[in-house]
Amino acid sequence: RPMSYHPNMTQRPSQALALATLLIAMPAFASDELQRQQPDTIIFAMMSGKCRTFKVGGRDLPCRAVAFSQTEEGRANFTIAINDPKDDSHIITFSGDNGRRPDANVYELPIDRMLLKSKDRPKADGLPVPAIEPATGLCRQVGNFVTLELTSISCTAVDRNGKSYELQYQSDGTPMAVRRIKRKRVGSPAVSPFDDVK
């Protein structure tokens, strides 16, 4: 069936705004390398629901939305838009490579870095460039990837400074909004949670 990246009309205005923020502010994979060519994003997906838990360094943070994205090179991200009235660019991303599908209804992504974006970061093309913190962890996405009716996303990671990151996100039952962009490169594509979606 056709896929759409537009939030449906039943979504709350805050979710629609968060989706727009995430679409515009996709993570840029660079710190000091602002001039490096960035890999193209080929999949963007957003779940409608709520954060049951989102903690950074043991501190609870309110989140507006959670999105999944994947680049042509295979790197995947779970990006959280934080509900911060003082900073609409406050975004934290669990980023990793070599995602896997241990069974049909589970996608696991080993995390090797956290991307931390805020209004105080240096900018490229007018958007904040995230700070990159090497980390170890895992994200797990559960649900029916064919119908896009996902159940939950859970992520845990610890960066090199010992700071912990934890996400527990629960779907409200609305099918995910997915945007798929045609690959430009040849070769075998990386494993995606949406490989079965046509």
Enumerate the predicted regions with their spans:
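Acidic, glycine-rich flexible loop segments
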Residues: L109-L167
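Short, surface-exposed linear segments at secondary-structure transitions and domain or protein termini
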Residues: D97-E108, V142-L148, T174-K184
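Long terminal segments
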Residues: L34-C51, R180-K198
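An ectodomain-focused feature that recognizes extracytoplasmic/extracellular
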Residues: S31-P110
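Bacterial N-terminal signal peptides that target proteins for export
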Residues: H6-A18
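Edge beta-strand at a domain terminus
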Residues: G96, G137, S152-V197
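N-terminal signal peptide c-region/cleavage motif recognized by signal peptidases
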Residues: A25-P27
